[in-house]
């Protein structure tokens, strides 16, 4: 009861801060989104915003993510672009280092700096020299998704609990035809799209190594490459992929439908992805009975987080109104909409998500992660796209090399190429950290 009273007080405080209607402020507030699935939340915010700013028009445009990033990269440095910058964590440094972000109001900075509201890992990615430059809004937190009917048919009583069990389950869940071709993947692996492939390979790597392949460096925006120091773990992850793509343990194939589409169609029994999969499968695979658990542990127990940050363009002519819109987006009804409609996990720890969880309890794995699970975030840096793409190309070429089956030394050589590729790119961009 006390928690709910505190949350109600916080929502009341938000309303007080917005104050009476402002009829003097006029103009157009522009918002661009690279995640169209959050549009409904912004429209809810727009309706509330108009009560405070009746003479400000709000324009919300949505784009495919890469198009969104490209448009921002051209417009913002030129002094234009949207008023509100909805920045993914890996592009946030580009706009901070480019001097494109407006100062945060003190009340929102206090929100970011209060651990009971925004957890420390998420505060840190937006903070430079003790000063936050954006509000972490939602996270894409990963988990292991599994088909309940497939597990039961294979005589498996529940989802895997360890890294080793993931691969053992994959072998038991795989179906093959008379010619030995995989017709249903035991686990759908990320085999294409090198940048995303690097990220998904990292889900496995973290549990074995206890660190990411690319950790934040000593200075914000710099990166340490950890592969060489954890070469045994890196090679083991590569070998496990290769041995489940070739030979008797084969549990996946490039010819199959992959990722969320494969899982929602029943073409895969397990896969690892972020929280948006829950509403996606509900919509696209309504007959699929599925569960989700944290990524199974090994040496370590961590969860990847992809974070969306809300900042204001320093060249905006409506900065105060833009920050008020961001305040409105913290409202309970709006963060509930983000979770329920898009599957992204709001980062406000002082909000009550029980209304959504009562309808979709699988979200609880994301909103209330285990106490001993480490929440980690990719090291944001301006060379992110190039680095993860080139490293992913090395790793995914390794996936196709059947000569690596049982070849630990060969796997180590591949992963050292990945290490050296990342180091060179980071040094060339001035982002490398020892």
Question: Where would I find each of the regions flagged by the language model?
Answer:
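Glycine-centered hinge/linker elements that transmit conformational signals in sensory
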Residues: 169-171, 217-252, 295
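A bilobed periplasmic-binding-protein/Venus flytrap-type ligand-binding module shared by bacterial periplasmic
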Residues: 145-148, 305-317
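Hinge/lid segment of periplasmic solute-binding proteins
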Residues: 89-141, 198-200, 206, 287-293, ...
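Extracytoplasmic "Venus flytrap"/periplasmic binding protein-like
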Residues: 44, 48-118, 149-161, 261-262, ...
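Long, aromatic- and glycine/proline-rich binding clefts that accommodate carbohydrate-like moieties
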Residues: 120-125, 286, 290-293, 340-393, ...
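Short, well-ordered beta-strand elements
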Residues: 25-36, 56-61, 84, 133
């Amino acid at each position: 009861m006390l928690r709910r009273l505190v949350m109600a007080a916080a929502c009341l405080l938000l309303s007080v801060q917005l104050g009476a209607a402002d009829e003097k402020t006029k103009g157009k507030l522009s918002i661009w989104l690279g995640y169209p699935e959050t549009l409904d939340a912004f429209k809810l915010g727009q309706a509330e915003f108009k009560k405070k700013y009746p003479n400000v028009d709000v324009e919300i445009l949505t784009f495919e993510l890469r198009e969104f990033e490209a448009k921002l990269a051209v417009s913002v440095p030129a002094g234009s672009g949207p008023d509100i910058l909805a920045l993914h964590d890996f592009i946030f440094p580009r706009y901070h280092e480019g001097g494109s972000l407006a100062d945060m109001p003190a009340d929102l900075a206090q929100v970011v700096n209060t651990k009971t509201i925004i957890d420390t890992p998420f505060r840190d990615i937006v903070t430079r020299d003790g000063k936050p430059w954006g509000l972490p809004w939602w996270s894409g937190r990963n988990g292991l998704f599994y088909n309940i009917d497939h597990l039961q048919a294979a005589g498996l009583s529940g989802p895997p609990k360890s890294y080793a069990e993931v691969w053992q389950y994959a072998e038991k869940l795989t179906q093959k035809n008379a010619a030995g071709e995989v017709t249903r993947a035991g686990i759908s692996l990320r085999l294409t799209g090198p940048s995303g492939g690097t990220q998904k390979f990292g889900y496995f790597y973290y549990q074995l190594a206890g660190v990411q392949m690319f950790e934040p460096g000593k200075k914000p925006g710099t990166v340490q490459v950890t592969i060489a120091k954890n070469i045994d773990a890196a090679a083991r992850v590569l070998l496990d992929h290769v041995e489940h793509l070739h030979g008797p343990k084969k549990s996946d194939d490039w010819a199959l439908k992959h990722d969320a589409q494969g899982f929602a169609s029943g073409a895969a029994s397990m896969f690892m992805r972020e929280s948006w999969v829950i509403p996606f499968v509900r919509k696209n695979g309504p007959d699929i009975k599925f569960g989700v658990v944290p990524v199974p542990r090994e040496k370590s127990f961590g969860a990847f987080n992809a974070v969306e940050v809300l900042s204001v363009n320093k060249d905006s002519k409506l900065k105060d109104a833009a920050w008020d819109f961001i305040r409105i987006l913290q409202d309970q009804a709006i963060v509930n909409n983000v979770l329920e409609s898009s599957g992204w996990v709001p980062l406000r720890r002082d909000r009550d998500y029980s209304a959504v969880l009562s309808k979709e309890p699988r979200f609880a794995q994301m909103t209330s992660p285990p106490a001993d699970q480490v929440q980690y975030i990719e090291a944001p840096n301006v060379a992110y796209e190039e680095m993860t793409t080139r490293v992913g190309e090395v790793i995914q070429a390794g996936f196709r090399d059947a000569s690596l089956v049982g070849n630990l030394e060969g796997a180590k050589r591949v992963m050292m190429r990945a290490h050296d590729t990342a180091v060179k790119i980071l040094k060339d961009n001035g982002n490398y950290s020892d």
